[in-house]
Amino acid sequence: MELQLAIDLLNKEDAAELANKVKDYVDIVEIGTPIIYNEGLPAVKHMADNISNVKVLADMKIIDAADYEVSQAIKFGADVITILGVAEDASIKAAIEEAHKNNKQLLVDMIAVQDLEKRAKELDEMGADYIAVHTGYDLQAEGQSPLESLRTVKSVIKNSKVAVAGGIKPDTIKDIVAESPDLVIVGGGIANADDPVEAAKQCRAAIEGK
């Protein structure tokens, strides 16, 4: 089981500083969509240039022109790139092909997908590296969690890894870990903690069953 830190609300310098503080406890560091909107792909490059032994994910949330956008993210140092599960099949297939051609990985974000079971099966057959169930920020505000979606997707896929995101914190991560996802994505639960290093350490301990 892997742990990913999602960083959304910092500039690229502060994001790299935070990532380096917690890198002993995480497997993947994400440059979140808000940072990419604010600073562009150079934020991904800054992270890639300033951290080692950790994969860098660019949360592009691609919807179209997929092979080009994947190629650009890779050019700027991304190891993993995200595309939306609601994108056209042709876009997702092109994104997977471009990523794999460069020995990189593609994560498909299931945010806003209505028929999770059907789409997860399709994406699994297409060869997505990760399928991520994601309770977005706006739905978290309504008290929703990704647990049920995680169970649904995990029950139908055969090859892809299952990732889970959405409001996960050190005090709730054990419920998620109990469902045995392949990748747990924690954002503010680490980034906004009073002590991010301690929060990351607690999350790592939880996924290692300690």
UniProtKB/Swiss-Prot annotation:
<dbReference type="GO" id="GO:0019647">
    <property type="term" value="P:formaldehyde assimilation via ribulose monophosphate cycle"/>
</dbReference>
<comment type="pathway">
    <text>One-carbon metabolism; formaldehyde assimilation via RuMP pathway; D-fructose 6-phosphate from D-ribulose 5-phosphate and formaldehyde: step 1/2.</text>
</comment>
<comment type="similarity">
    <text>Belongs to the HPS/KGPDC family. HPS subfamily.</text>
</comment>
<dbReference type="InterPro" id="IPR017553">
    <property type="entry name" value="3-hexulose-6-phosphate_synth"/>
</dbReference>
<keyword id="KW-0554">One-carbon metabolism</keyword>
<dbReference type="GO" id="GO:0019854">
    <property type="term" value="P:L-ascorbic acid catabolic process"/>
</dbReference>
<dbReference type="Pfam" id="PF00215">
    <property type="entry name" value="OMPdecase"/>
</dbReference>
<dbReference type="InterPro" id="IPR013785">
    <property type="entry name" value="Aldolase_TIM"/>
</dbReference>
<dbReference type="GO" id="GO:0043801">
    <property type="term" value="F:hexulose-6-phosphate synthase activity"/>
</dbReference>
<dbReference type="GO" id="GO:0033982">
    <property type="term" value="F:3-dehydro-L-gulonate-6-phosphate decarboxylase activity"/>
</dbReference>
<comment type="function">
    <text>Catalyzes the condensation of ribulose 5-phosphate with formaldehyde to form 3-hexulose 6-phosphate.</text>
</comment>
<dbReference type="GO" id="GO:0006207">
    <property type="term" value="P:'de novo' pyrimidine nucleobase biosynthetic process"/>
</dbReference>
<dbReference type="GO" id="GO:0006730">
    <property type="term" value="P:one-carbon metabolic process"/>
</dbReference>
<protein>
    <recommendedName>
        <fullName>3-hexulose-6-phosphate synthase</fullName>
        <ecNumber>4.1.2.43</ecNumber>
    </recommendedName>
</protein>
<dbReference type="GO" id="GO:0004590">
    <property type="term" value="F:orotidine-5'-phosphate decarboxylase activity"/>
</dbReference>
<dbReference type="InterPro" id="IPR011060">
    <property type="entry name" value="RibuloseP-bd_barrel"/>
</dbReference>
<keyword id="KW-0456">Lyase</keyword>
<dbReference type="InterPro" id="IPR001754">
    <property type="entry name" value="OMPdeCOase_dom"/>
</dbReference>
<keyword id="KW-0119">Carbohydrate metabolism</keyword>
<dbReference type="InterPro" id="IPR041710">
    <property type="entry name" value="HPS/KGPDC"/>
</dbReference>
